[in-house]
Amino acid sequence: GHFVYGHIDCVTPLIKIIKLENSWEFHFEKKFNKNNRFIVEKGSISINGISLTVAKVENKKFMISVIDHTFNHTNFKYLKKSDQVNIEFDYLARFILNNE
């Protein structure tokens, strides 16, 4: 995990959920303008207060993958397509990129 402070930087909609054999994929809209640079593959992000790793980044969306245990023990099991989620960007990434 990474440091999660509970600050909400923005919200974004969930656009797709895919159930795989032992995990779930959650696809979110990426519409953060200048903050898009904080979303990188294998980087950290907090969604609804949960520390997660970004699995894939595309031009207008990003995806995280969660194992069944994470799905069943977090609020992710209640999410539905079009739900708005709270996003907190990784503080260390933000600090480094803002001080280049």
Question: What is each PLM-predicted segment?
Answer:
Residues G1-E100:
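Conserved loop->alpha-helix
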